[in-house]
Regions:
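Active-site bordering "gate/hinge" segments
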Residues: 2-252, 376
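Short, glycine-/Ser/Thr-/acidic-enriched flexible segments
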Residues: 53, 117-119, 157, 226-228, ...
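Short, solvent-exposed amphipathic alpha-helical segments in soluble enzyme
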Residues: 62-67, 227-228, 271-274, 297-300, ...
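Short acidic-glycine loop/turn motifs at beta-strand connectors
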Residues: 215-216, 225, 275-277, 368-371
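Oxyanion-binding "anion nests"
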Residues: 238-283
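A structural signal for short secondary-structure junctions
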Residues: 249, 264-267, 274-275, 299-303, ...
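Dual-mode signal for accessory low-complexity, basic/Gly-rich regions
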Residues: 282-347, 366
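Intrinsically disordered terminal and processing segments
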Residues: 334-380
């Protein structure tokens, strides 16, 4: 296979999983999640969170988990439930959580989150301070989740298709391809991508300084002795990135993010940051600046970078407005404001983790200790 084939993880031999045949079949998707992503074993408890719009996938997940002699625990949210919570919640409901919520996570062996929104702008009218308070309060739940086998994925809905400017059928086919479920052997496909990314990590692991250059961007940061993670579909499905946590006080320069972001259903675009000794000292956005400023004020860690990631999935070629896909686009780099992933060696703690994307496909460059890693969206 060519380097591009490896980057897309495309296989050339058949396998044993049920194929989607170009259409997104819930049974094939569920088998991939229960088998490859979570590696569910007999006797384990799998906590699955989603909305009722993911019913076809949830029913097949129940089957796939039971077939592995494990216990499925489905937590299904109703349309409007999250907005209704923020509208009616009193202070204690924003600043605390029930003990059972943490107990479930601690007792689960694996945790699967499935995005399936009915309205991507459901929270657009909610005071961002209420959202931030709730996020801060639930930090122990997030930290407990990170210690488990966990995976985040997506089930296509009409709202997500509209956000991506696609028809429902087009978006479902797009998702199927991004998951490699249109391939004869999806697991082998993800293995091919993992191998490509492992070679990329081999080039990055000994690097001390990364430099990101593009129009409006010239940023340096240190990744010395930090651990690079090969995101091969086990934590995110789809995936296609390698990432690490930069040294918290090392980022210097400016960066312009060129892909629209939609956190909590709020459009944010044209974000520009100035960083000095790791901290954001100036920030602006052409759209959604009020949200940007509130996000940076979430807590002490929100003004520092928790992640740098390099997208490698050339099967995802266009932004969709959904970060699960967009941060994986081959030829892009993303930086996260806020929380680090502990496995990278990153030490930044925050209730915020907001990925922002810089597209390098039209004149950008990423170097490691002066060596070109990626230029104009191509790996070298």
């Amino acid at each position: 296979m060519t380097a591009s084939d490896h980057a897309r993880g495309r296989p050339d031999a058949p396998g044993e999983l049920r194929r989607a045949g170009g259409q997104l079949e819930p049974a094939a998707f569920a088998d991939l999640l229960a088998g490859y992503c979570l590696d569910v074993e007999a006797g384990q408890t799998v906590l699955v969170r989603s909305t009722s719009l993911a019913e076809p996938l949830l029913l097949e997940l129940q089957r796939a988990i039971l077939e592995r002699d494990a216990w499925p625990l489905l937590r299904v949210e109703l349309p409007g439930q999250t907005r209704g919570y923020y509208d009616a919640a009193r202070d204690r409901h924003l600043d605390d959580f029930p003990d059972l919520a943490l107990h479930e996570v601690r007792r689960a062996d694996a945790i699967l989150g499935i995005q399936a929104p009915g309205d991507v702008r459901e929270l657009a009218g909610v005071d961002p301070d209420r959202i931030a308070r709730h996020a801060r309060a639930r930090r122990p739940i997030r930290e407990a989740t990170m210690k488990k086998r966990w995976c985040s994925t997506l089930w296509p809905t009409a709202a997500l298709a509209e956000q991506a400017s696609m028809s429902a059928e087009e978006f479902a086919a797009f998702v199927c391809s991004a998951l490699f479920l249109d391939q004869p052997d999806p697991v082998r496909a993800w293995g091919g991508l993992a191998a490509f990314q492992e070679r990329l990590i081999g080039r990055l692991s000994d690097a001390s300084e990364l430099r990101l250059e593009a129009e409006g961007t010239d940023l340096t940061l240190s990744v010395a002795k930090r651990t690079w993670v090969n995101s091969d579909g086990r934590r995110n499905m789809p995936s296609g990135e390698v990432f690490t946590g930069p040294h918290e006080r090392s980022a210097n320069g400016r960066v312009r993010f060129t892909v629209r972001s939609s956190p909590a259903g709020i459009d944010v675009d044209g974000v520009e940051l100035q960083l000095r000794d790791g901290e954001v000292v100036a920030a602006s956005a052409t759209v959604g600046e009020a949200y940007l400023q509130r996000a940076l004020a979430t807590d002490d860690g929100a003004r520092f970078l928790g992640e740098i990631g390099i997208g490698t999935n050339f099967g995802i070629a266009r932004p969709t407005g959904t970060i699960l896909f967009d941060e994986k686009i081959g030829g892009t780099v993303h930086l996260a404001l806020g929380r680090s992933y502990p496995e990278t060696g990153g030490k930044n703690r925050s209730a915020l983790h907001w990925d922002l994307i810089c597209d390098l496909r039209a004149g950008g460059r990423l170097t490691a200790d002066g060596e070109v890693i990626q230029e104009n969206g191509r790996f070298f």
